[in-house]
């Protein structure tokens, strides 16, 4: 327990509420929506979009195409040139941006139609059990792969080893607090 003496309130679990109960209440209150799409919890941020749904509550099902907010619309390959400065993405296809944020958004716009970076992550939840969540992260995956290629060409095997050890350790502590 992280904060002894604090009561944890879990109404969804305690009241055994189901998604259908939520939908029924919203309909009764006059809220109209595409309930097929509402089956999924979608959270978008700078580094990607997480997608949760009934399929992620199992250990063997993948998410269907329609669960992802960015549909696969492109199939003809394109080449993209990335420019880094001190490890940060600053340019895409020869255009240098004022901020890395703008460069990331530009790369995301190019990569998103290819449905790059889709997967299901399995990890430890805050309550100590394993959990699964789908995600799409086109620009981050390309940036990571770009960094990995640069590292292969510039670091020794022992530098790579220790960099990976430190990255895993740092990532866990950053995530876990």
Task: Name every feature range the model reports, one short phrase each.
Residues 1-177:
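Nucleotide-activated chemistry modules centered on ATP-dependent adenylation/adenylyltransferase
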């Amino acid at each position: 327990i992280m904060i002894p003496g604090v009561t944890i309130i879990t109404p969804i679990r305690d009241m055994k509420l189901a998604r259908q109960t939520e939908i029924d209440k919203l309909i009764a209150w006059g809220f109209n929506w595409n309930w097929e799409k509402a089956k999924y919890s979608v959270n978008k941020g700078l580094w990607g979009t997480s997608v949760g749904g009934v399929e992620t509550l199992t250990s063997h099902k993948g998410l269907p195409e329609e669960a992802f907010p960015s549909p696969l619309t492109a199939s003809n390959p394109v080449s993209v040139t990335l420019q880094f400065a001190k490890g940060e993405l600053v340019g895409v296809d020869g255009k240098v941006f004022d901020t890395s944020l703008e460069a990331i958004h530009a790369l995301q716009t190019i990569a998103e139609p290819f449905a790059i970076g889709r997967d299901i992550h399995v990890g430890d939840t805050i309550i100590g059990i394993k959990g699964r969540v789908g995600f799409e992260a086109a620009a981050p995956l390309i940036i990571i792969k770009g960094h990995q290629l640069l590292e292969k060409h510039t670091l020794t095997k022992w530098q790579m080893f220790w960099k990976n050890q430190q990255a895993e350790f740092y990532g866990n502590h950053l995530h876990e607090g």
